[in-house]
């Protein structure tokens, strides 16, 4: 799993920053999008029922995915490439969120792994370390 996380992080950075300055153009938006994940993780940690926790994480992740994909459109075709790469890599993690479109308030219906919350948190952390070195 660690190899998949590191590989995903590397590929997303290469794809998103393909023109040399894509990531800085939507950095603030990505920081805003992180709030969806952080809120979901905080709320899920207070829940007792495993299914309710999973639904909360899936809804937060779906909102985050939609937010990041929208933000990356500032980099022209990077949004499609980022989404394709993430979908491919994340699908390989196995456990998929159920159709949360019915249970999420305005949630975006995507097929993603519940474990990808961890991937995105690591991606965000690595992203901020990367940006602080520039």
Curated annotation (Swiss-Prot):
Annotated GO MF terms: toxin activity
Propeptide: 19-56
Keyword terms, alphabetized: Secreted, Signal, Toxin
GO terms under cellular component: extracellular region
Signal peptide: 1-18
Tissue distribution: Expressed by the venom gland.
Protein origin, superkingdom: Eukaryota
UniProt keyword annotation of Membrane present: no
Annotated compartments: Secreted
Function: Probable secreted venom toxin.
Protein name, entry field: U35-theraphotoxin-Cg1a
Organism whose genome encodes this protein: Chilobrachys guangxiensis
């Amino acid at each position: 799993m660690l190899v998949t996380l590191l590989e995903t992080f590397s590929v997303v950075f290469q794809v998103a920053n393909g023109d040399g300055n894509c990531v800085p153009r939507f950095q603030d938006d990505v920081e805003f999008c992180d709030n969806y994940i952080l809120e979901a993780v905080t709320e899920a940690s207070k829940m007792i029922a495993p299914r309710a926790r999973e639904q909360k994480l899936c809804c937060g992740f779906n909102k985050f995915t939609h937010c990041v994909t929208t933000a990356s459109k500032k980099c022209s075709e990077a949004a499609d490439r980022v989404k394709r790469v993430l979908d491919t890599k994340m699908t390989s993690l196995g456990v998929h969120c159920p159709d949360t479109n019915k249970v999420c308030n305005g949630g975006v219906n995507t097929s993603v792994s519940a474990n990808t919350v961890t991937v995105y948190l690591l991606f965000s952390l690595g992203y901020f370390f990367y940006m602080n070195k520039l």
